[in-house]
Regions:
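Donor nucleotide-sugar binding/catalytic pocket of nucleotide-sugar-dependent glycosyltransferases
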Residues: 1-42
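Short hydrophobic beta-strand element within catalytic cores of glycosyltransferases
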Residues: 139-142
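A charged, aromatic-enriched C-terminal amphipathic alpha-helix characteristic of glycosyltransferases
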Residues: 173-216
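Aromatic "clamp/platform" in nucleotide-sugar-dependent glycosyltransferases that forms part
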Residues: 122
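Nucleotide-activated donor-binding/catalytic signature segment of Leloir-type glycosyltransferases, i.e.
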Residues: 87-105
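Short acidic/histidine- and often glycine-rich active-site loop of Leloir-type glycosyltransferases
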Residues: 29, 88-90, 144-161
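Short alpha-helical donor nucleotide-sugar binding micro-motif in glycosyltransferases
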Residues: 101-102, 109-114, 195
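Conserved donor-binding/catalytic core segment of Leloir-type glycosyltransferases
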Residues: 9, 45-74, 78
């Protein structure tokens, strides 16, 4: 169905590579974005022991939350989200704080009041919560896997380590402003600009029956 397309957009380099191995041509990157008018640093106090290490997302087995909750960390382990594993996790980890699902301004305030965003999943292909946390000024601690690796790469805004505890502690040394600056280049405006750039690179149809051609111009940088 997609193979005749002039361009196939993929959200991450890993997804783009997977599509190419499956025979898809003209694969181009179109990353996701974050609403920096909502997610940004602000002075909020959750009245919890610090540092605060939040993890945000669906509470399910595939999210690997126990890898985070098993860690012996200073301060508070904060879990935001709901899902089928919530009751079992609350029983097993009474020392962690479970807030349930939060959205919009309420979620943004939780990010802003925290210190290090912990992303224990090894199965996510992107993870918009990573960008939300970074925009709020939170360095990221995660495993070096698809998802965090695609979003953060080699940028000094997080620590990717097979030892998640080490990642959490080392991330405390990362300046929050570096995270905000990184996220500023990944807004929804920037994402839309990349989409438009890709669309403009499709040559218009000539004679009836002619297939439009996609002209690749290398990496696109949204202004």
């Amino acid at each position: 169905f997609h193979r005749p397309s002039q361009a196939v957009m993929a959200a991450t380099p890993a997804l783009a590579a997977e599509l190419r191995t499956r025979g898809f041509g003209n694969v181009v990157l179109w990353s996701r974005g974050v609403d920096t008018s909502l997610f940004h640093p602000r002075e909020i106090d959750l009245c919890l022991p610090q540092p605060v290490f939040p993890s945000v997302g669906r509470l399910a087995v595939e999210k690997n939350l126990e890898a985070f909750l098993d860690l012996d960390l200073p301060g508070t382990k904060l879990v935001v989200g709901d899902g089928p594993a919530r009751m079992a996790l609350e029983r097993k980890y009474p020392d962690a704080v479970f807030l349930g699902a939060r959205h919009g301004e309420e979620l943004a305030e939780i990010y802003a009041a925290a210190d290090i965003f912990v992303f224990p999943s090894k199965t996510d292909t992107f993870g918009l919560v990573l960008l939300e946390a970074l925009a709020s000024g939170l360095p990221v601690a995660a495993f070096p896997v698809t998802g965090p690796r695609d979003v953060i790469g080699a940028s000094p805004v997080g620590v990717l380590n097979e030892d998640l505890h080490t990642a959490c502690i080392e991330a405390l040394r990362i300046p929050r402003q570096a995270c905000v600056a990184f996220a500023a280049g990944h807004t929804w405006h920037a994402s839309a600009r990349v989409f438009v750039d890709h669309a403009l690179n499709v040559r218009p149809l000539g004679s009836p029956g002619e297939v439009a051609e996609f002209v690749a111009e290398g990496p696109h940088v949204a202004a």
